[in-house]
């Protein structure tokens, strides 16, 4: 085990604070509409230009181990806020720096760190309740667009396209972000349920122009095993042929004689059929087949529940308004399943999303939920160069998270105003002793910091503007983009409540840990490896080796 370097008391806290300042000073220049960019070196390729706080924080590793510990703890604030709310990382970092700075001054003056922490926690709790009271729901597409615009660093094209996507696929819908091929942002919306499996034979194609199989008002057969024997399928095929409707078969696989017979029947026009493989693998395949069954009103033919293919009837089949099968994907539009069943299935999947601890599983469950509940929208980000594309894509993803948070918990006035208004709830708060009162004052002072930083980044005098905003009431605030005062909500400067709340709670949590730190332990720096001995061979008079 390597030797350790241990620092105590004020010495440890000072080193930790230096690390906090290095990280926070690099991150906070990005805050607000007039925030600056940060350029990040990459080990290969062009450098990355970003205004995203968490991207800057993640890049920072310091040489001094004790400074690095401080930086990593604040980095945790940014990451945690990003994970919970998807945005607000810079605000959280600015709040944490202010709380730690003021807290360590109080500790150096001889106050009890534990009482300071209790006071800060009490103040943040009161401020959080006040934020919830200030919060207003975010129903209008216009408000969603404004939240997206603010989060995307005042790029209104991003805010507008996100609002449009949300309107089309609903709150539960999946919105994904991809690299585009043009200079403009584009929006693609897939209605209905789409999964990534195409036709098993090109002979099923009936629309030569789009190279797809299109089935109007088809029956849908769902089977969880392979189909290789046509005899098993005959009863269903005869029933479908009599009804004069097309048939979509979704099974683990359709092969051999069964596939050949289906192709021949389709070519001759006896019955219009298309076969596709079931989506997913293993348990996920079973779950997705069940989703399709509920969406279309079908029953999954499975030997596990005592159903066999040769005994299947038309009542076991589902229906939909239209099905489109391409080379790589199948889209079922307007399935005829019951609304009540679909809602119940969505609730079940939501419960699984809450329970799962795996990010991958959560993503897949949310995809399934979107396919059942709304649809899928793809935002294709357009840019002139790859560097711009990466930077813009990161901003779109940030804005998307922020708008989801706004829909979830509502909105508060932006530009640091909500936190200034929340100070009112903390003003008359009293702690159990003097040190707790100082803790409350520390949190109160820190809550002014985001507004001060936004104003400083805009090149104005923070104290003057803060005083004027604090004298106002409600949504009155300062628009740093154009230097005007007014109603922040009317000016479209909004923050999701969830983002502001998470930033405040997470920064207080880490600041509390840091001011109550009394010792820090790190590995001793290793001495450089000894130099290689001079060349030469034994008994040869130290003859140099070439």
From Swiss-Prot:
This enzyme's EC code(s) = 5.6.1.7
Binding positions (ATP)? 30-33, 51, 87-91, 415, 479-481, 495
What UniProt keywords apply to this chain's record, in alphabetical order? ATP-binding, Chaperone, Cytoplasm, Isomerase, Nucleotide-binding
**GO MF entries:** ATP binding; ATP-dependent protein folding chaperone; isomerase activity; unfolded protein binding
Q: Which InterPro entries match?
A: Chaperonin_Cpn60_CS, Cpn60/GroEL, Cpn60/GroEL/TCP-1, GroEL-like_apical_dom_sf, GROEL-like_equatorial_sf, TCP-1-like_intermed_sf
Any Pfam family from its record, for instance, is Cpn60_TCP1
Catalysed reaction(s) here are:
ATP + H2O + a folded polypeptide = ADP + phosphate + an unfolded polypeptide
**Where does the protein end up?**
Cytoplasm
Residues spanning the membrane: none
HAMAP family, sorted = CH60 (MF_00600)
Q: How does it assemble?
A: Forms a cylinder of 14 subunits composed of two heptameric rings stacked back-to-back. Interacts with the co-chaperonin GroES.
Write the protein's name.
Chaperonin GroEL
Q: Which organism is it from?
A: Allochromatium vinosum
Name of the gene encoding the protein in the UniProt record = groEL
